[in-house]
């Protein structure tokens, strides 16, 4: 039996001359639970150690004489080595094992992601068929899907690698050494009290300012807080009155607050503040019927409708009326059979003013020219009237013109149609006719020929003194005549003694 025949089976197999085994490795060492240690810690990127399952180990005896022996760093966990090694070597071994385990996990995750990408391709084919049948919401997704899938795969791989690196670094920072981060106050979620104070001040300044319609910044006064408190009180009063109505008790909370609401609505320049703080919604609750289908108090309805029928509240936009429900509340009062005639008239005018922007009608008639008035009237003219107007503008032929009796008027200025005949004229039919609405369009405004206002007849200033003297004289003579008419009794009756 030769020297080589007594060797291990690994030595008898054809060995690779590139990767020798360290002299420390002996055949009596216990096997690692994770498999072959040399294969696990072998450098994947090294050109000298290609990964091959059939590459056997080579002992130092089979290596050629004089050739340099290359060793690989292999760590074998044994009881003797663990006793001899210090804490620093244990820490290094833990870091190396975590890093190598993370590399293997990353490799398996990449393979898993590749399989998922194949499944996603199949799913993409299904989605493409579904698009061909039913269509898609946007066409841009069809062109961007392959790029998005590749980006998603790259993000998944990067995220997994970053998590693995974080897990590797976490045991080192959690040790007793002071090499870790110095932030002991909660990490990234820590926030200084000074930053909190600055954020509160910034939010307070943001509440105190608002953007105007022209893009400028308007400073809001202290009316916001007052109006907000008033709105809360108004809603609470409306709720109390509804509860009292359900319990068959007198509801007087809104009546008590009516003077306060009237005072705030009469203030100038506060309409925008009222709208922003929800005053209109509270006002609609005040005008809404009670649970027993009865209207609110008459004083509330009269006061609120008169205050709303102010030019300041005519310019409420459509969104405000819709969100607050104020338009529905006023319309309900206009259509309610128990509402008074005066309140219905005010509600009708108010609805007409609010509806003008919906029909694109201007509220200021002084700036409208004659041509604009004619165009607006023509656009609002019914189709039948337009056809008649076009037929009149066209000059009909004498043969096709309808034959109507024509006469000369009294002054002989021109012909007159039979419809314009007066009683006593030839062809006039003296009978009653059904009145019809006039289809005339009055576009010419009559001119005002009076220069100044007429206040009545004025008397001369010189006669005032004479009239005053005459009135004084008449009063004195009237008193003297009254004294003379006293009857004197000869017998001494009615005498003051």
From Swiss-Prot:
Residues 1-191, 369-433 are annotated as: Disordered. Pfam families: Med26. The keyword Secreted does not apply. One of its GO terms (cellular component) is nucleus. It comes from the Eukaryota. Keywords: Nucleus. Residues 123-134, 144-160, 181-191, 370-382, 401-411 have a biased composition (Basic and acidic residues). Residues 7-23, 47-57 have a biased composition (Low complexity). GO terms for biological process: poly(A)+ mRNA export from nucleus. InterPro entries: RNAPII_TF_IWS1, TFIIS/LEDGF_dom_sf, TFIIS_N. Gene3D superfamilies: Conserved domain common to transcription factors TFIIS, elongin A, CRSP70 (1.20.930.10). It is found in: Nucleus. Residues 281-361 form the TFIIS N-terminal domain. Belongs to the IWS1 family. This is IWS1-like protein. It comes from Caenorhabditis briggsae.
């Amino acid at each position: 039996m030769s020297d080589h025949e007594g060797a291990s089976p690994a030595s008898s197999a054809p060995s690779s001359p590139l990767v020798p085994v360290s002299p420390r490795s002996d055949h009596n060492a216990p096997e690692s639970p994770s498999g072959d240690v040399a294969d696990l810690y072998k450098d994947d990127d090294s050109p000298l150690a290609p990964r091959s399952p059939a590459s056997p180990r080579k002992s130092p005896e089979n290596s050629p004489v004089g050739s340099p022996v290359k060793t690989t760093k292999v760590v074998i966990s044994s009881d003797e080595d663990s006793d001899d090694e210090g804490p620093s070597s244990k820490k290094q071994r833990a870091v190396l094992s975590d890093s190598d385990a993370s590399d293997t996990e990353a490799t398996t995750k990449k393979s898993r992601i590749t399989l998922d990408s194949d499944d996603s391709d199949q799913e993409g084919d299904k989605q493409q068929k579904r698009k061909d049948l039913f269509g898609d919401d946007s066409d841009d997704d069809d062109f961007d899907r392959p790029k998005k899938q590749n980006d998603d795969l790259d993000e998944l791989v990067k995220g997994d690698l970053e998590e693995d690196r974080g897990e590797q670094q976490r045991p080192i920072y959690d040790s007793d050494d002071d090499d870790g981060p110095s932030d002991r106050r909660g990490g990234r979620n820590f926030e200084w009290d000074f930053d909190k104070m600055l954020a509160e001040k910034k939010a307070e300044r943001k509440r105190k300012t608002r953007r105007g319609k022209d893009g400028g910044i308007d400073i809001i006064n202290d009316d916001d807080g007052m109006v907000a408190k008033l709105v809360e009180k108004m809603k609470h009063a409306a709720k109390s009155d509804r509860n009292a109505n359900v319990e068959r008790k007198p509801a007087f909370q809104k009546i008590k607050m009516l003077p306060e609401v009237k005072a705030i609505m009469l203030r100038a320049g506060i309409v925008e503040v009222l709208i922003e703080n929800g005053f209109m919604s509270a006002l609609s609750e005040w005008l809404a019927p009670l649970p027993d289908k009865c209207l609110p108090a008459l004083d509330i309805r009269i006061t609120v409708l008169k205050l709303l029928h102010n030019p300041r509240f005519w310019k409420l936009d459509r969104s405000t009326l819709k969100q607050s429900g104020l338009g529905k509340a006023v319309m309900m009062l206009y259509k309610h059979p128990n509402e008074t005639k005066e309140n219905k008239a005010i509600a009708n005018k108010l609805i007409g003013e609010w509806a003008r922007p919906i029909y694109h009608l201007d509220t200021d008639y002084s700036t409208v020219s004659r041509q604009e008035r004619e165009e607006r009237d023509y656009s609002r003219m019914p189709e039948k009237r337009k056809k008649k107007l076009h037929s009149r503008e066209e000059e009909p032929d004498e043969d096709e013109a309808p034959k109507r009796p024509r006469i000369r008027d009294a002054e002989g200025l021109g012909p007159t149609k039979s419809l314009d005949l007066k009683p006593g004229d030839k062809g006039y039919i003296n009978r009653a006719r059904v009145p019809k609405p006039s289809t005339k369009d009055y576009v010419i405004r009559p001119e005002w020929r009076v220069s100044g206002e007429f206040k009545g007849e004025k008397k001369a200033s010189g006669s005032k003194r004479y009239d005053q003297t005459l009135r004084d004289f008449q009063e004195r003579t009237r008193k003297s005549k009254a004294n003379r008419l006293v009857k004197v009794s000869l017998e001494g009756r009615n005498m003051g003694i």
